[in-house]
From Swiss-Prot:
It comes from Kineococcus radiotolerans (strain ATCC BAA-149 / DSM 14245 / SRS30216). GO terms for molecular function: ATP binding; ATP hydrolysis activity; ATP-dependent DNA damage sensor activity; damaged DNA binding; single-stranded DNA binding. Pfam families: RecA (PF00154), RecA_C (PF21096). The gene is recA. Keywords: ATP-binding, Cytoplasm, DNA damage, DNA recombination, DNA repair, DNA-binding, Nucleotide-binding, SOS response. This is Protein RecA. PROSITE patterns: RECA_1, RECA_2, RECA_3. Its main location: cytoplasm.
Length: 348
């Protein structure tokens, strides 16, 4: 075995050759540079940001959001788009389902005039467009809605009864191999919305599975299972849903945490409702009977009145949010564009 000095010299020569051939930084020691905190895009729900462990969806990664129909998958994705845009970012939406409602997106805070939208004809076209946008380096977030609607060209051009086993799975596998590296270099967050199917003949365990094969399960850094658990009513009139999200996979923080929040019809995720829930849980907001109080000030009788009070007094909501994030250690929220210095983006 060569002497330690000779090994170090040989390694330095190899690293110099790699830098010359492939560019500086192609290989580096993790301890050479101080790694900044993971940049994130807030989800619009403080409870979900807390469950994710880092304050939002990680940038430069693949995120999968799946669940039953009308559970709130697209709503969560659109809130993330709105958060990215508010921080000055550029967003794209690949509408493979041809079902995007611009009016609803605008109500959630999405700048629909600036949103890049594509309604592709085939799955290949959708993923090629996504790849080109990601490789431009200008994008902060891209949403593909949905994986189930990414129909391969061969299936579209074939007859209705033809068998096309594994085509979509191969398409997704090839696409994810291409775009994962590009996402990391560009700092773009890619959200894949997915649907549920049931496997036939399952005797034990859950028969539920997602479409598009197994590649997305492997490449995703975060997987969110979105479920509607309750209908919110004003008297007898339904006004929204209580939604539970389980973080079933998380490569950037401990997984399996859960978040619950309210989605109000026509308004999206209730930020104020989330602040009240977490405020009560962590002792910042006091609940006595039906009354909610904060620092001796009454917020209202009943959650709806307290929610309305915080909506009318946004500074108070910001104060509660700041205290919650400081206590839970998720204050280092990096939701500004990637080119901004890390020190400028930290908000405690």
């Amino acid at each position: 075995m060569p002497a330690p000095a000779d090994r170090e010299k040989a390694l330095d020569a190899a690293l110099a050759a790699i830098d010359k051939n492939f560019g500086k930084g192609s290989v580096m020691r993790l301890g050479d540079e101080v790694r900044p905190p993971i940049e994130v895009i807030p989800t619009g729900s403080i409870s979900l940001d807390v469950a994710l462990g880092i304050g939002g969806l990680p940038r430069g990664r693949v995120v999968e959001i799946y669940g039953p129909e009308s559970s709130g998958k697209t709503t969560v994705a659109l809130h993330a788009v709105a958060s990215a845009q508010k921080a000055g970012g550029i967003a794209a939406f690949i509408d493979a389902e041809h079902a995007l409602d611009p009016d609803y997106a605008a109500k959630l805070g999405v700048d629909t005039d600036a949103l890049l939208v594509s309604q592709p004809d085939t799955g290949e076209q959708a993923l090629e467009i996504a790849d080109m946008l990601i490789r431009s380096g200008a994008l902060d977030i891209i949403v593909i809605d949905s994986v189930a609607a990414l129909v391969p060209k061969a299936e579209i051009e074939g007859e209705m009864g033809d068998s096309h086993v594994g085509l979509q799975a191969r398409l997704m596998s090839q696409a994810l191999r291409k775009i994962t590296g590009a996402l990391n270099h560009s700092g773009t967050t890619a959200i894949f919305i997915n649907q549920l199917r049931e496997k036939i003949g399952v005797m034990f365990g859950s028969p539920e599975t997602t479409t598009g094969g197994k590649a997305l399960k492997f490449y995703a850094s975060v997987r969110l299972d979105v479920r509607r658990i309750e209908t919110l009513k004003d008297g007898t009139n339904p006004v929204g849903n209580r939604t539970r999200v389980k973080v079933v996979k998380n490569k950037v923080s401990p997984p399996f945490k859960q978040a619950e929040f309210d989605i109000i019809y026509g308004q999206g995720i209730s930020r104020e409702g989330g602040l009240i829930d977490l405020g009560v849980e962590h002792g910042f907001v006091r609940k006595s009977g039906a009354w909610y109080t904060y620092e001796g000030d009454q917020l209202g009788q009943g959650k709806e009145n307290a929610r309305a009070f915080l909506r009318d007094n946004p500074d108070l909501g910001d104060e509660i949010e700041k205290r919650i994030k400081e206590k839970l250690g998720i204050g280092a929220r990096l939701d500004a564009p990637a080119e901004v210095d890390v020190e400028e983006k930290v908000d405690f």
